[in-house]
Design a protein with these regions (language model features):
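Catalytic cores of nucleotide-sugar-dependent glycosyltransferases that transfer UDP/GDP/TDP-activated
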Residues: 1-475
Length: 475
């Protein structure tokens, strides 16, 4: 099967968030499973020079951008047995950051149109074009309007994946005239609430639509989660499905991870205790093996559940024998709160400002319990990494958390969960974990089940292959 995977970022070339992790892992797994999956991304100025040195020039052409044509250079490279294509235009992409520019709508309208224009030049006729988030949402729109009836482009199916429905590519209608270039007779495809909405256009015109977890696919049909797109998604519910993301189980492997204080496995967990002791020492926490250590690695923003933590952590620290560490940065109100808590509970609570990947791995491996009380969570990777390292997650049953963490009350459980977005419910779930850790044998079995959880990309990739095959049957 021939798949063109379109994304605005992909590791190791360019990345600013979770999409880069997905685009850097899923296509490679698909290739290992025998699929011809190729990736296309912008040629950003931020791509490291050593990676640019591996690129080869193919050709250049012009791309329609509303009423004008813009230069497009096309490059390719091989990386980890996958073919990458790079769309080049220095005016659009040679900038210090990937996003946040005044002309992002124009930049990614150009990118979306260039993806379709490049296909004859690379002599690659994909069976499926897989688009991701609003930055490539115009690809199925442009295909439907301008390319589907051209002989070379016949019978190409499209899949549009929503990684976070909050970011929809919503702009005023002047953007259509200057950047997007949809005929006036067809603007209803992109219209929502009087504005131009790129994600809405993709939902309407793509062959299929997916999200990054089954529960999130169900949730975004509800007004509470949809950010206004529930009517569109309910109208086209038949094309919507959810596939849970995976993690790189080769990188996140407690048996071989060189960044851990000591390696361990599900069959020999003795090294995990040393990871905890060394982490406590590094963070100036009391070195007590018998005191449960609760960890968080997160952005400090409200939708990650930080308002619940702010309401309930002080009471937990006062009434329970526990330690707490959090690594992250974000809203100042939460940063100030954790600085206050660190001063109030010296030796028991540590706030590590910023994000240090090496320290994050040490928290995943050294903590006993991992807290993730999100208000919304399309998929989430942190809970799956914690499971991989045998650190028991306490999560709210929402989105991908609900699909990957199952309460220990069930025989197959691998963590502790709560449903309502309430401080008392979160506190009870944490207390249940603190009570559970006192049962050494039961906790060891829970850790074993956690480490046995299959959150690999192999499983997710097979689900995507099944979805691709099903999509090819659609008219």
């Amino acid at each position: 099967m021939r798949i063109l995977y379109c994304a605005s970022e992909a590791n190791p070339f360019c990345g600013s968030g979770g999409l880069a992790d997905v685009a850097g892992s899923l296509p490679h797994t698909l290739c290992r499973k025998g699929q011809d999956c190729r990736i296309v991304v912008p040629l950003y100025g931020t791509i490291p020079q050593e990676l640019k040195n591996s690129m080869n020039f193919i050709t250049n052409f012009t791309v329609p951008v509303a009423w004008r044509h813009q230069y497009c250079g096309l490059f390719w490279a091989r990386w980890n047995d996958c073919t990458y294509y790079f769309i080049d235009n220095e005016y659009y992409f040679k900038r210090g950051t990937l996003y946040g520019h005044y002309d992002d709508a124009e930049r990614f309208a150009f990118f979306s149109r260039a993806i379709l224009e490049m296909l004859p030049y690379i002599d690659f006729h994909p069976d499926i074009i897989h688009c991701n988030d609003w930055q490539t949402a115009l690809v199925p729109v442009y295909y439907y309007l301008f390319y589907s009836h051209r002989p070379w482009y016949y019978n190409i199916k499209s899949l549009f994946t929503i990684h976070n429905i909050q970011y929809q590519g919503e702009y005023g209608w002047e953007v259509n005239t200057e950047c997007v270039g949809i005929p006036a007779s067809e603007t209803k495809i992109l219209e929502m609430n009087g504005k131009l909405n790129m994600m809405k256009g993709a939902i309407e015109t793509a062959t299929r639509v997916s999200t990054v977890s089954p529960s999130y696919a169900a949730e975004i049909k509800d007004p509470w989660f949809s950010w206004g797109l529930h009517d569109e998604l309910n109208l086209r519910h038949y094309k919507l499905c959810g596939i849970k993301n995976g993690i790189d189980t080769e990188s996140y492997n407690p048996e071989t991870d060189y960044q851990l204080y000591r390696n361990y496995s599900k069959d020999d967990m003795s090294g995990k205790g040393e990871c905890k002791r060394a982490l406590q020492e590094r963070l100036c926490l009391e070195q007590r093996w018998d005191v449960p250590l609760v960890g968080m690695v997160t952005r400090l923003v409200a939708h990650k559940g930080l308002d619940l933590v702010r309401m309930g952590l002080e009471e937990l620290m006062d009434t329970e024998n526990m330690q707490f560490v959090i690594l992250g940065s974000g809203d100042k109100e939460f940063e100030d709160y954790f600085n206050y808590m660190q001063a109030k509970y010296p030796g028991r609570l540590c706030f590590c400002h910023g994000f240090v990947p090496e320290l994050a791995r040490k928290i995943y491996s050294g903590a006993d319990i991992f807290l993730m009380p999100s208000a919304q969570e399309p998929c989430g990777l942190a809970q799956m990494i914690a499971l991989r390292y045998g650190t028991i997650p306490v999560v709210r049953e929402v989105g991908g958390l609900k699909d990957s963490v199952f309460d220990s009350a069930d025989n197959y459980g691998n963590g502790f969960t709560f449903k309502n977005y309430e401080c008392a419910d979160m506190q009870l779930a944490v207390r249940r974990a603190l009570w559970g850790i006192q049962d050494d044998q039961g906790w060891h079995q829970l850790m074993w089940r956690a480490m046995m959880s299959d959150n690999s990309w192999d499983r997710s990739a097979q689900d995507y292959i099944n979805l691709y095959n099903d999509t090819l049957k659609w008219a």
